[in-house]
A protein has these predicted regions:
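N-terminal secretory/targeting leader peptides
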Residues: 2-3, 9-13, 18, 27-121, ...
């Protein structure tokens, strides 16, 4: 499909939605629009549906939700831009990588080896360690991080199998757009490149790249196993995916609905995180049993971590995230 034409129709649809939402509110019927890149089976979509369910429960009055799935309104970076502008998308789950324009420290909380395990990550969230980043994003982007989903463990999938650091040398791998991902993967000896998430499949198929990295749910949903049938269990990152809400939208809503949204988002984030973290192994085992994916133990994970940690520490200094990184490391 012609990319410019596709983008035109997507933006046109978003513009129409923005006008329609305003009209509905003016008539007194509140309708909120959400967006997900994935279908009903993905944990992100399920998390947003849980959010909607909880809002209705806590608000106790009529409120309508329209959740646009399967990238109908673009990708996560588009959702964040729409929420920043107060149009088209009121709520979505978005990768911190797409928030770096407004807060340099945002992608750091989703970087490789920042969290030791799920227990540490859950404590970081519960203790409010990430609040300074959320506050900066709210101030500069007017997008509120009201809950924290994620919990998926990211590993490398590729056209070839390997089990040690020698195998990843010069590996042409797609990484997320935040600079910390390029720097850490280069430090480990790989050849990272940034391309759109929606182009990863074609990128491997055409030989532009030979690998990517993702959580189990993403590998299954995007069918990356078809082009990268070997999944090396590097377990190099645990994802954090905030449930975001447009500040411009929230301020236009009744106070009791605002309170319900805040409470529901926090609970839905915890719920989605548990769902995603608990389904990782079962998804990968299922794909392997079906002959779609080969799980390959990675024997030098500690060496990979050691190669990346100096870059993480230096980057934390550059972006003013030293205090946050220190607090994360202090949590056992």
């Amino acid at each position: 499909m012609d990319i410019s034409r596709s983008k035109f129709f997507r933006l046109a649809s978003a513009a129409l939605l923005a006008g329609w939402c305003t009209t509905v509110w003016a008539q007194g019927t509140i309708t909120l629009h959400g967006a997900s890149q994935f279908n009903d089976e993905h944990p992100f979509t399920k998390g947003l549906m849980k959010f909607e369910e909880l809002v209705k429960k806590y608000y106790g009055k009529p409120v309508n939700f329209v959740l646009h799935k399967n990238s109908e309104l673009g990708l996560e970076k588009d959702y964040f831009a729409y929420m920043n502008q107060g149009i088209s998308v009121d709520y979505a789950i978005v990768s911190p990588a797409h928030m770096s324009t407004f807060a340099k420290a945002a992608p750091f909380i989703d970087a490789p080896f920042v969290f030791r395990d799920h227990d540490q990550m859950n404590k970081v969230i519960a203790q409010g360690v990430l609040n300074p980043i959320a506050d900066e994003i709210a101030k500069k982007a007017d997008v509120l991080l009201l809950g924290y989903g994620g919990g998926g463990v990211r590993s490398i999938f590729a056209t070839k199998a390997f089990s040690d650091m020698a195998g990843i040398k010069n590996l042409k791998i797609r990484v997320q757009g935040a600079p910390i991902w390029t720097r850490t993967f280069k430090a480990a000896g790989m050849a990272p490149t940034v391309i759109a998430y929606s182009e990863v499949y074609n990128g491997i198929q055409t030989g532009v790249i030979e690998a990517g990295e993702n959580e189990a749910a993403g590998v299954e949903q995007m069918k990356f196993y078809e082009v990268g049938p070997n999944l090396m269990q590097t377990r190099h990152a645990i994802s954090i995916r905030p449930i975001c809400f447009s500040g411009k939208t929230l301020r236009r809503l009744p106070a009791d609905l605002q309170a319900a949204i805040r409470k529901a988002a926090a609970e839905a984030g915890d719920w989605e995180r548990q769902l995603e973290s608990s389904s990782d192994t079962s998804i990968l085992d299922k794909l392997q049993k079906e002959g779609k994916l080969k799980l390959v133990p990675f024997n030098e994970r500690d060496k990979m971590r050691e190669s990346m940690m100096p870059v993480l520490s230096e980057y934390a200094k550059e972006i003013g995230a030293e205090a946050i990184f220190a607090k994360i490391n202090a949590i056992k």
